[in-house]
Every structure is written in C-alpha cells, then in structure tokens.
C-alpha cells in the first residue's frame, strides 16, 4: 500500500508506493 503522498503540480495529490516516486514534494500520508 502507499507509504507516502506527494503533490505533483496540476496533477494534485497522489499516493505513491515508494518515496522515490514522490515528486516534486514529499508529504506524509493522512492518518485517517
């Protein structure tokens, strides 16, 4: 399951399976 969320420009927020795939900004996933 996704371990992090990232904001990708106009794409908005996207959850990625690895931190390496989080660009350009790394954000923690909401606990909920």
Swiss-Prot record:
The keyword Transferase does not apply. It is found in: Secreted. The modification 4-hydroxyproline is found at residues 2, 24, 28, 30. It comes from the Eukaryota. One of its GO terms (cellular component) is extracellular region. The cysteine framework is XXIX (CCC-C-CC-C-C). This is Conotoxin Cltx-4.
């Amino acid at each position: 399951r996704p371990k992090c969320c990232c904001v990708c420009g106009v794409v908005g927020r996207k959850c990625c399976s690895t931190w390496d795939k989080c660009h350009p900004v790394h954000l923690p996933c909401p606990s909920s």
